[in-house]
Swiss-Prot record:
<dbReference type="GO" id="GO:0030983">
    <property type="term" value="F:mismatched DNA binding"/>
</dbReference>
<dbReference type="InterPro" id="IPR036187">
    <property type="entry name" value="DNA_mismatch_repair_MutS_sf"/>
</dbReference>
<dbReference type="Pfam" id="PF00488">
    <property type="entry name" value="MutS_V"/>
</dbReference>
<dbReference type="InterPro" id="IPR007860">
    <property type="entry name" value="DNA_mmatch_repair_MutS_con_dom"/>
</dbReference>
<dbReference type="InterPro" id="IPR000432">
    <property type="entry name" value="DNA_mismatch_repair_MutS_C"/>
</dbReference>
<comment type="function">
    <text>This protein is involved in the repair of mismatches in DNA. It is possible that it carries out the mismatch recognition step. This protein has a weak ATPase activity.</text>
</comment>
<feature type="binding site">
    <location>
        <begin position="614"/>
        <end position="621"/>
    </location>
    <ligand>
        <name>ATP</name>
    </ligand>
</feature>
<dbReference type="InterPro" id="IPR027417">
    <property type="entry name" value="P-loop_NTPase"/>
</dbReference>
<dbReference type="GO" id="GO:0005829">
    <property type="term" value="C:cytosol"/>
</dbReference>
<dbReference type="Pfam" id="PF05190">
    <property type="entry name" value="MutS_IV"/>
</dbReference>
<keyword id="KW-0067">ATP-binding</keyword>
<dbReference type="InterPro" id="IPR016151">
    <property type="entry name" value="DNA_mismatch_repair_MutS_N"/>
</dbReference>
<dbReference type="Pfam" id="PF05188">
    <property type="entry name" value="MutS_II"/>
</dbReference>
<keyword id="KW-0547">Nucleotide-binding</keyword>
<dbReference type="Pfam" id="PF05192">
    <property type="entry name" value="MutS_III"/>
</dbReference>
<comment type="similarity">
    <text>Belongs to the DNA mismatch repair MutS family.</text>
</comment>
<dbReference type="InterPro" id="IPR036678">
    <property type="entry name" value="MutS_con_dom_sf"/>
</dbReference>
Amino acid sequence: MSTPENFDAHTPMMQQYLKLKAQHPEILLFYRMGDFYELFYDDAKRASQLLDISLTKRGASAGEPIPMAGIPYHAVENYLAKLVNQGESVAICEQIGDPATSKGPVERKVVRIVTPGTISDEALLQERQDNLLAAIWQDSKGFGYATLDISSGRFRLSEPADRETMAAELQRTNPAELLYAEDFAEMSLIEGRRGLRRRPLWEFEIDTARQQLNLQFGTRDLVGFGVENAPRGLCAAGCLLQYAKDTQRTTLPHIRSITMERQQDSIIMDAATRRNLEITQNLAGGAENTLASVLDCTVTPMGSRMLKRWLHMPVRDTRVLLERQQTIGALQDFTAELQPVLRQVGDLERILARLALRTARPRDLARMRHAFQQLPELRAQLENVDSAPVQALREKMGEFAELRDLLERAIIDTPPVLVRDGGVIASGYNEELDEWRALADGATDYLERLEVRERERTGLDTLKVGFNAVHGYYIQISRGQSHLAPINYMRRQTLKNAERYIIPELKEYEDKVLTSKGKALALEKQLYEELFDLLLPHLEALQQSASALAELDVLVNLAERAYTLNYTCPTFIDKPGIRITEGRHPVVEQVLNEPFIANPLNLSPQRRMLIITGPNMGGKSTYMRQTALIALMAYIGSYVPAQKVEIGPIDRIFTRVGAADDLASGRSTFMVEMTETANILHNATEYSLVLMDEIGRGTSTYDGLSLAWACAENLANKIKALTLFATHYFELTQLPEKMEGVANVHLDALEHGDTIAFMHSVQDGAASKSYGLAVAALAGVPKEVIKRARQKLRELESISPNAAATQVDGTQMSLLSVPEETSPAVEALENLDPDSLTPRQALEWIYRLKSLV
């Protein structure tokens, strides 16, 4: 920070600021001064750039002008949102002392720290996306990873075994803020991510972590959570929890448990697969035309977030899946009645988190009340649904009649945004508050009554009651009648023609009225805090209710989608395989203006690989992706876009579909392609679904063909994975003749002159041609270029109609591992010592090598 070294030379106020800033050197400090939050020195310069606000100077301290920038306190949320979106963290420093009684600067302290991963304010969060704080740890045995959604209390840990799995977890969870140890070795894994925070090693100590977690959950050990034997995950979780406590400056009662996420419990998808399948984000980085955009018609934000978690973590437990299927089927006749009521529930999950953090605002409590008011109707509607899982959700959501009654009595119908604005607590809730409000609102009536009463009592017709800003309330009597003033009248002010008095009753009333607004507001704040105390004992049950409501929203939504989009319930089978009748791509069918051409698929242990050929734009990639998406939907318990589906166990989904240069890492398209291919070949199993599209196209024809052949052979013969293998190498269509479990299918097209019509229908057998020139013409390549290409094609076909095919077969794939026969010239050169040759001997060797070549 650009500050003078001599601390004592600063003004008392700046000394206070500098002490607070020294405690938070790496983040911006919002320092409350009256109606503004001020920033000074380097913070002011940074904020002026980040927020586009004016940079000014505030006098001088220690002889130097102080750079300053400020924002109005009532607009702070908008500015915080901008900073958080840029990955910045902010310490909020408030005035906690009373200016009237303070000697020197008003006492101030940092009351909270706003960071990208620990925000809970509604204005700072995207309502339909999780906002995660994460921590990563690494030792010689692997990684530890923990995530916390502070806006819901959801706390998870895992222990990814290798770099690829860790990268997939980072891509799946996409944390807003990531904590890492100062000696973290795999920086290339996290570099470039938003919200990186370097933390000291001691925060990751295992003993500290266990102590922190036991203290948080009120337990003696962590056995009950199933995380006792996950030391790497616990190291990450301990650091994460400590950071959350440090930033919130309060207890975190809504974080009540921690859950271990195990690799074997869900279908694993690496980063490339999530990207290529466009689950929640399309390839351009947006949310349009994704699987979530089709499936997510949930009516609550918390339901939307839960559905996205399901999509990114499909479960393998068929008991869970069958229960979801049964529930979706049972709910299909009730969606029209349930969704309007569920819509009124709102985002109860995040409201409860703010309640736990004691940052809930009046409108949060009003929304909570509104959610409670929907529960009786919801429960009544669900009573008619013949489904045990639905009835379990109905019981779990509860009714909370007492809490509903409390909030109906306590909070007005439409409260202001902030409790400090007053007028939050309803009339009739607290007698003392009503009195203070009556005093503040009813001073005029009281003074009129007092004036009438005192005139009658004293008989003085010139007596009147009034108010003066300097002297307060008074009773005024004309000079001519002042000698008749009662003995209990104490003179307050003498005027030319009148005397002004005060009586104990009026003085007491004056004190009440002058402080009634302040007293009413202070009492209102106290009563508001007491509401938290009355609600928080029910937090656990309320969180269970919110979870049940979110799950109900997801299941009702999937029931509506199944009915509206004509989906079918898939059947799970024990053996590996996928059989699809009339399958459709869930996203493409929604954006097409013409009917989607449905296609079948049959993969089984006896038919493990399909070699897919056909023209570009013919639908090969769509066919492959729809298979993966149907499998993914089945494994979240959803119905699927097909006439009939039977699907066996799946442990992983891999996609090697399309590629682009990774310029940031210095990797070419071909290198990216080969890296993804290597990951598949190392990690796929017989229970994996593998999509391979155009392997080997980034290098020379023979190199690419050889690699594609070897990869296909490895997947079919050794790994035995369920594989869809799209290619333009027609030589690969010979694979079914050379190995078991491989079949050809193709997507056809009709060519007429210079035009081509894509049939988009999958047929058995290999394609007859690739139609590449017709597609090029369709794309607008100049006619003379197309004409020349046709000539060249005829030349090449006449020269070598089947050259590649004669070179590549199942017995010759050893060319990838066995070097070509070395020429005699090369052998002679390898045995030659050039330093020992005379000029004459060198000349002789040149002639000898010439003869060998």
